[in-house]
Amino acid sequence: MAEKRNIFLVGPMGAGKSTIGRQLAQQLNMEFFDSDQEIERRTGADVGWVFDVEGEDGFRDREEKVINELTEKQGIVLATGGGSVKSRETRNRLSARGVVVYLETTIEKQLARTQRDKKRPLLQVEAPPREVLEALARERNPLYEEIADVTIRTDEQSAKVVANQIINMLESS
């Protein structure tokens, strides 16, 4: 990878976007951003609180603005929120401003990785988590696929292995 292209990670919650993103940025000596963490930094509140107070629409508006600003940077790795792809504007910006890597995982892995995480507002509901994740997958997976330049399944692999796969795919493209 001679020039530093932006790398944008998309996929469902629990796919490993933040963990893999940090690993990838470290290996490539690039700056790492996480859109949820950036929203928390700017608001001084966690994403669950923003979700509760502003609702999903308010949160998505903030997310779209943050992703727009971050994708204007050069040479970054960005882990996006799982629902960021719901915005057509965000999908267009991600596609136009960098390489989009879809980190794919199974519902079982998502359940295992998110079961103790209280910072997942969409899982803090009455419905069983499996049903919530299945509904989100039906809605969002086609959107991830629509903009993905590369798709990698993360289920049984370490962040370092996935980061190396991404680097190898980018170098050969």
Curated annotation (Swiss-Prot):
Subunit structure: Monomer.
One term under GO cellular component: cytosol
Organism expressing this protein natively: Sodalis glossinidius (strain morsitans)
Keyword Nucleotide-binding found: yes
Function per UniProt: Catalyzes the specific phosphorylation of the 3-hydroxyl group of shikimic acid using ATP as a cosubstrate.
InterPro entries, A to Z: P-loop_NTPase, Shikimate/glucono_kinase, Shikimate_kinase/TSH1, Shikimate_kinase_CS
Cofactor note as given: Binds 1 Mg(2+) ion per subunit.
Enzyme class: transferase
One Pfam family in the UniProt entry: SKI
Family of this protein: Belongs to the shikimate kinase family.
Compartments in which it is found: Cytoplasm
Catalytic reaction(s) noted: shikimate + ATP = 3-phosphoshikimate + ADP + H(+)
Cofactors that this protein relies on: Mg(2+)
Keywords: Amino-acid biosynthesis, Aromatic amino acid biosynthesis, ATP-binding, Cytoplasm, Kinase, Magnesium, Metal-binding, Nucleotide-binding, Transferase
GO BP of this protein: amino acid biosynthetic process; aromatic amino acid family biosynthetic process; chorismate biosynthetic process
UniProt: Mg(2+) binding residues: S18
Location, primary (coarse class): cytoplasm
Residues that hold substrate according to the record: D36, R60, G82, R140
EC number of this enzyme: 2.7.1.71
Pathway: Metabolic intermediate biosynthesis; chorismate biosynthesis; chorismate from D-erythrose 4-phosphate and phosphoenolpyruvate: step 5/7
Gene: aroK
GO molecular function: ATP binding; magnesium ion binding; shikimate kinase activity
Matching NCBIfam families: PRK05057.1
Amino acids binding ATP: G14, A15, G16, K17, S18, T19, R120, Q157
Protein name per Swiss-Prot or TrEMBL: Shikimate kinase 1
